Amino acid sequence: MATTLERPPVPPVTGWVYRTCGVTGLKLHRPAEQLMKANAVAATVALLIGGVSAILILLTRWQAVHLLDPVMFYRVLTAHGITMLIFFIIFFEMAVLYFAAGPLLNSRIAAPKLGWFNFGLMSVGAVLVEVMIWTGKADVLMTSYIPLRADPLYYLGIIFFAVGALLVCFQFFATLVIAKREQTYRGSLPLVTFGAVTAAIIAVITLLHGAATYIPAFLWSVGLISMDPQIYRMLWWALGHSSQQINVAAMVSIWYLLGALTVGAVVLNEKLSRTAFVLYILFISMASAHHLLVDPGFSSAWKVVNTSYFMYMAVLASMLHGFTVPAGVEIGQRLRGYSQGLFGWVKRAPWGDPGFSSLVLSVVVFGFVGGITGVTIGTEQINIVVHNTFRVPGHFHATVVSGTAMAFMGLTYYLIPLIFQKKVAFWRLAQIQPYLFAGGMLVFSIFMSFAGGFGVPRRHWDITFSNAPFEQAFHPAVDALLGIMALGGLVAALGGGIYILVTVWSVFFGQRFTEAERLAGVSGIPQGLVRPPRATTLADEDTLPTGRLGHAPGTMVLVLVFLLAFAVYYFANWKLLSFVWKIG
């Protein structure tokens, strides 16, 4: 077993270009530090815009309120999808790439000026897209399916953003070469950096598909070429779904990092974790096919091979990480004396540390809700009763929003003191923020999925079809489900608002702290930085359980609970499918 975050030897620090972190001992290249800050701030701005649009959509889909008119609803829905799933997530991931290649490897980054060019290109692209959407020139939803036509500048903005992100990935790879050549670390890449490499490789594949989608779409929008709608859909989902798999790889990397920072989590088996990351690279993009399961232009064989065989290899990777991360946390706790009973390590965990609580909630909601629903609705036969219902956004709000965003939020509470060198403002609010956000999103996702089970459509302004020549009556329970969903969403929005408040205030108006204040554990500094987890010894390993459930018996029990929940949900959906086609 190895620690998740191993500290390489720190080379001599000279000049103003570098500084050494007093907590981790890592050398920080100041240009990389500034680029991390810029991308993190841009991500927070995108989160604010996307969060406001989310509230407007929520209060419209809640039939009792029905806030927006149809034109504005689809405009806001377009902005919400692009801003949250593309701009917020990818800006933050760019910050993660700079962190994983620079500070974690004690390396300088390649071509800092190129980094600023990339950031400027991404920012210009994002602003261009937002302007086109909010001025009513791109009411085409996030997918912008052909033949819906937006202003050419909309497509150009996305191309700018994608090219900037692609260049950051190449800059990341170049930094790895520099670190290897200058021997800033020993042995193989740290696991967190290896996960970031996985995310960057998937990003390159994804962004190349984006170029194959949006460059022709731009030419089509100015009338130079024609496009086939089915080909566009296939290429777009190679971008749209794969972009969320960048999130998965980045999220899992952050899980390992937060585990190490908060409780000194260990890595059970480096080869196993790295193999799981490789499975992501090889198979996760093929899961994009589950968005095309009802499209008549693709054969059943193609659909089944991609979603019922290749996709399961990526699912296997997630399940491996879903075991190794909590097991690493459990063993890390037990090695440090918290070994009473099956779940004594849970009771003694630092639940007041927002970094740790974000980690746990991210793993739980992503696995138990997002993961189980994703595999189920990706099955060809079951998908026929799920496609275009509320069950689809119910799934990805549990994965991207509750899983990925929670991991990013948890990491932020450590980046503020480590990178910005400031206390986390409004510490009490920061401590409850993960519970509000995750709890609200859990209710939101579950009840949205329940409503989808009654056939409530996604992306629809008015499910009552008012003034239509026909009437669609839903089960009376739908109104109650949508009401509870809305309340959960509002609680999550409150949690998201607190995160933005804490982050913005800390970064721009926060107080710097001294080394004495850190050691004294003043408010606003996470526990993992006040009392870093002590190094373990061979004697500590002798205290680990050796029973039939191994060194992590608590995690083994939780895994069995997960598998039981998975089986019940999966086979219940086959039972529901039988109600669609009655025989006899």
Predicted regions located by residue number:
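Membrane-embedded and interfacial regions of multi-pass energy-transducing membrane proteins
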Residues: 2-534, 555
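Acidic/proline-rich low-complexity IDRs
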Residues: 4, 537, 575-576
